[in-house]
Amino acid sequence: MKEIPITSFDNIQIGQAENTAGGTGCTVVLLGKDGAPAGLDVRGGGPASRESELLKPLAAAQVIHAIVLAGGSAFGLDAAGGVMRYLEERGIGFDVGVTKVPLVCQSDLFDLTVADARTRPDAAMAYAACVNAETGNYRDGNHGAGTGATVGKLLGMEHCMKSGIGSYAVQVGDLKVGALVAVNAVGDVYDFETGRKVAGLRADDGKTFLDSERVLMRQLDAPQEKFVGNTTLGILFTNAKLDKARLCKAAGMAHDGYARAIRPVHTSMDGDSIYAVSLGDVPADLDAVGVIGARVMAKAIVRAVEAADSAYGFPAARDM
């Protein structure tokens, strides 16, 4: 098993755009002129998404043409319109006779409390991300959907840390499996291989870590206003030949990577979602893809927080 760049998969282009001052951005994954099969598994209690019904195994469409990860919560769902315009201009989409309709799925995270709540990803920003995808401007850290991402928010934003977007991919023989993830969790992030806490909830001194799970358990009977602005958004890529049903299962198995790296995870305060996309025709066992997928997803989560820089008054892991 060797590490490879997330950009080494065929038939994808990844572009990002952001409004740094406004504290938000979007990441667009274009899936080629013919699109690609995809599945989705949502485990969090508060998702903001678009066209997710397309990815159910019984839905008619067998491929989609792009995936958008963005900030802005439900407001940011406007961004997909820019991707649709970009693809329509290039004749990419589902042929309905009179035109071609691009099938664009999107999931958003909540970053409205980071900088300017009135600044959200829109069609113009997503169109710019598509243009950037032509040359490939993907970077881990405070970019794209990770621009306003934070973690460790159980006690409010004054106790959280800066996060971002991260990636990790491997190759085993001919099989490639990779993950891209924007980490905006209410919980803490751990290196699952060492048990070390990388980023998360900070004590009042701003320097000491608290354990979010222990804090939550102590508040079991205490009245509280739960902070609802969270969500970790991931995409699992593989060149294995998988249909929608199997991709939905692979996405579900990749959620194990969330559980390894984020504590607590899949709460009512999160909208945790994972897409899975098939980008090739390599024969591979579904369970093998899922096991590798969970591993690369956990590694990508750690990379997202380690690559982040302090911003908007929130310290990053490298500052602790």
Task: List each language-model region with its residue ranges.
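Alpha/propeptide regions of enzymes that mature by internal proteolysis
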Residues: 1-320
